[in-house]
Amino acid sequence: MAKAIPRVGSRKNGRISSRKSARRIPKGVIHVQASFHNTIVTVTDVRGRVVSWSSAGTCGFRGTRRGTPFAAQTAAANAIRTVVDQGMQRAEVMIKGPGLGRDAALRAIRRSGIVLTFVRDVTPMPHNGCRPPKKRRV
C-alpha cells in the first residue's frame, strides 16, 4: 500500500499561522454594499478572493443603528485595518446600494491612507423589473 501524502496545512505538520495573514496584497478591490438596514464592506484581491470583511452588525451595532452612517464608517475602518497591515497600498472601490452608509464608508476608506484608483457605483438598476414596495403612510 502506498504511503499517505501529508496534507499541507494540517495540524500534524506543525503549521499554525493562517494562510491569509501570510499573503501580501499590494492592490485590491473594496466592495461596499449599503442597504437601508446594514452596510457590508468586503475587501478582495484583484482576482476576487476575499481578504477581509466587516459589517455594521459584526461591529456591535444592532437594530436600526446598523443602518446609520456612523455604523458604516466603523465597519469600513474595521475591514480596512487588517488589509493595511498586509501591505495594501492601492484599491478600487465598488459601491452598491441606496443606503445611508455609502458616503460615510467612502470617507472612512479615503481616511485610511489607501490610494484609490477609481470609485464606481455598481448599484443594480431595474429596466422596469419587480414592482417596488408601496409608499409609507405615516
Curated annotation (Swiss-Prot):
One example of a Gene Ontology biological process annotation: translation
Disordered as annotated region, ranges: 1-23
Ribonucleoprotein listed as a keyword: yes
Disulfide bonds: none
GO MF annotations, alphabetized: rRNA binding; structural constituent of ribosome
Gene3D superfamilies, sorted: Ribosomal protein S11
GO cellular component labels: chloroplast; ribonucleoprotein complex; ribosome
Cell compartment(s), UniProt: Plastid, Chloroplast
Keywords: Chloroplast, Plastid, Ribonucleoprotein, Ribosomal protein, RNA-binding, rRNA-binding
Subunit structure: Part of the 30S ribosomal subunit.
Protein name: Small ribosomal subunit protein uS11c
Chain's gene name: rps11
